C-alpha cells in the first residue's frame, strides 16, 4: 500500500470530526466511499483511464486539511476584482471548499432557483439532495471520486426549476487561501429540471503561493429539453495540483456545452464522463490547454451514447512549450441500442519545443450499425513555411511564433458562446503566450 495509507489512517482517526461538521445526506455515503477507497487504492498507470498521470505520486505529500471548518479570514467580494467586462453575472465565491455566505450578490434570482451551500439545503430540503448526491459519481468506479466523497464536508448546490431560464450567467470563483500547504475537497451539484436553461462560469484562482492539492467532483443533471453551458477556467500557479471529475447526465432533447480552459497551473487532471439518457440530446465538449515550463495537463473523457439519435462533438487543443507534458484520452462509447448516433472527436496539438511531450489517444467503441462517427488527432510543430513568410515581412521570430500559436487555439475560443467571455479569453491567451500571465491578473490578493 502506497500513499493511500495516510488517507485511510486519517479517516479512521477523524471520521467523527468530519461527520460532525457536515450534513446527514453527505455522511450517509461517506463510510461506503471509505470502503471503496480502501479496496481500490490510488489507480496505478496500469489502469487505462489513468495511464498518463501517476496519481499516487500526486497525493504523496503531507497536506493539511481544515476538518474543523475554521473560518478563513477573507472577504472575497472586497478583495477579488477579476470580473469579465460587459458580462453581467450573479457572482458567488467558494473559499477553499466552503461556500461563502456572509455576503451574497445583490442580483435577484428567479423564484425557486437555489445557489447555496449543500449542507444548508440538505438541512432544509434533504429529499432534494438525496435524489441526486453521489448517484452518478459512483465511488465504486473511481478512487478519486471515492476519496472526495469520503472527505468532502460541504459543497455548492445549484438548482434551476422546470422551465426557468436564467438571464444572467452564474459565476463561481473558487479561491484557494491558506497559510500552510493545504488539501481541498470541493463538491458541486447542478440540477436543471425540464426546460430549464443556465450558464455557469467556474474560475479557479489562488490567493496564496502555498502548495495546494484540490480534488473536485461536479455532478450535473440536465433534464428533458434543458440547456446547460459550463465553462471551467483555471488560472492558478505552478504549486497547484488539481484533480477534477465531472459527471453529466442528459435527458431527451437536452443540450450541454462543456468547456475547459487551462491557462496556468501546476499539475491538472480533468475527467469528463457524459452519458445520454434520452433521445435527441446533443453535447459539445471543448478544451484549450496552454502549458510551458514543467506544467502538466491530462484530459480524459468518456461520452456514453446509450440511446438513439444523439449527437456529440469534442474538440481539444493543446499548445506545449519548454518541458510541459500534455495528455488527451477520449473514448466515445456507442451502445447497441444507440442507432443514428452522430459523433465527432478531434484532438489537435502543437508542440513548440523538442523537450515538450504530448500523449493522445482518441477511441471509438461502437456496437450499433447505423451511426456516423469519426475521430482523429494530430501532433505537430510550428509551420516552418508560415514562420518564414512572416519573417520575410519584418515580423520577429517571437512575434511570429505568438501569432501562429494564437491562431491555433483560436478555433476553440471562438466556440465560447458568451461573447464577453470569448473576448476576455482572447486577451488572456495573448498575454499567456507573451509570458505576461502567471496567474489571475485581476485579484488584489495575489502579491
Predicted regions and their residues:
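N-terminal amphipathic, basic helical "cap/leader" segment at the start of enzyme domains
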Residues: 1-146, 315, 321
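Conserved beta-strand/loop scaffold segments within soluble protein domains that form the structured core
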Residues: 111-116, 124-395, 409, 413-447
Amino acid at each position: 500500500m502506497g500513499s493511500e495509507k495516510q488517507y485511510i489512517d486519517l479517516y479512521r482517526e477523524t471520521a467523527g470530526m468530519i461527520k460532525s461538521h457536515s450534513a446527514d445526506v453527505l455522511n450517509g455515503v461517506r463510510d461506503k466511499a471509505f470502503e471503496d477507497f480502501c479496496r481500490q487504492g490510488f489507480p496505478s498507470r496500469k489502469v487505462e483511464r489513468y495511464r498518463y498521470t501517476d496519481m499516487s505520486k500526486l497525493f504523496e505529500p503531507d497536506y493539511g486539511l481544515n476538518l474543523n471548518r475554521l473560518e478563513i479570514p477573507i472577504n472575497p467580494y472586497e478583495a477579488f476584482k477579476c470580473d469579465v467586462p460587459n458580462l453581467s453575472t450573479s457572482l458567488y465565491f467558494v473559499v477553499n471548499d466552503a461556500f461563502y455566505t456572509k455576503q451574497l450578490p445583490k442580483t435577484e434570482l428567479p423564484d425557486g432557483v437555489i445557489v447555496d451551500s449543500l449542507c444548508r439545503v440538505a438541512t432544509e430540503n434533504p429529499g432534494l439532495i438525496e435524489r441526486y448526491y453521489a448517484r452518478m459519481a459512483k465511488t465504486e468506479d473511481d478512487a478519486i471520486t471515492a476519496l472526495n466523497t469520503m472527505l468532502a464536508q460541504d459543497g455548492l448546490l445549484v438548482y434551476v426549476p422546470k422551465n426557468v431560464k436564467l438571464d444572467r450567467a452564474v459565476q463561481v470563483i473558487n479561491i484557494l487561501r491558506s497559510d500552510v500547504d493545504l488539501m481541498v475537497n470541493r463538491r458541486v451539484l447542478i440540477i436543471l429540471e425540464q426546460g430549464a436553461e443556465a450558464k455557469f462560469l467556474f474560475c479557479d484562482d489562488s490567493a496564496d503561493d502555498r502548495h495546494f492539492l484540490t480534488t473536485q467532483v461536479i455532478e450535473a443533471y440536465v433534464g428533458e429539453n434543458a440547456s446547460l453551458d459550463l465553462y471551467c477556467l483555471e488560472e492558478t500557479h505552478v504549486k497547484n495540483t488539481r484533480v477534477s471529475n465531472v459527471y453529466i447526465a442528459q435527458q431527451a432533447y437536452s443540450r450541454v456545452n462543456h468547456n475547459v480552459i487551462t491557462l496556468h497551473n501546476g499539475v491538472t487532471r480533468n475527467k469528463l464522463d457524459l452519458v445520454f439518457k434520452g433521445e435527441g440530446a446533443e453535447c459539445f465538449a471543448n478544451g484549450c490547454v496552454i502549458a510551458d515550463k514543467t506544467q502538466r495537463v491530462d484530459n480524459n473523457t468518456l461520452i456514453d451514447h446509450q440511446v438513439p439519435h444523439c449527437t456529440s462533438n469534442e474538440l481539444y487543443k493543446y499548445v506545449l512549450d519548454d518541458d510541459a507534458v500534455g495528455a488527451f484520452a477520449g473514448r466515445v462509447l456507442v451502445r447497441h441500442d444507440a442507432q443514428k448516433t452522430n459523433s465527432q472527436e478531434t484532438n489537435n496539438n502543437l508542440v513548440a519545443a523538442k523537450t515538450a511531450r504530448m500523449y493522445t489517444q482518441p477511441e471509438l467503441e461502437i456496437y450499433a450499425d447505423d451511426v456516423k462517427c469519426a475521430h482523429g488527432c494530430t501532433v505537430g510543430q510550428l509551420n516552418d513555411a508560415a514562420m518564414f513568410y512572416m519573417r520575410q515581412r519584418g515580423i520577429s521570430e517571437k512575434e511570429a511564433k505568438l501569432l501562429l500559436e494564437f491562431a491555433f487555439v483560436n478555433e476553440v475560443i471562438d466556440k465560447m458562446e458568451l461573447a464577453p467571455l470569448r473576448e476576455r479569453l482572447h486577451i488572456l491567451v495573448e498575454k499567456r503566450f507573451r509570458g505576461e500571465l502567471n496567474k489571475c491578473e485581476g485579484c488584489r490578493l495575489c502579491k
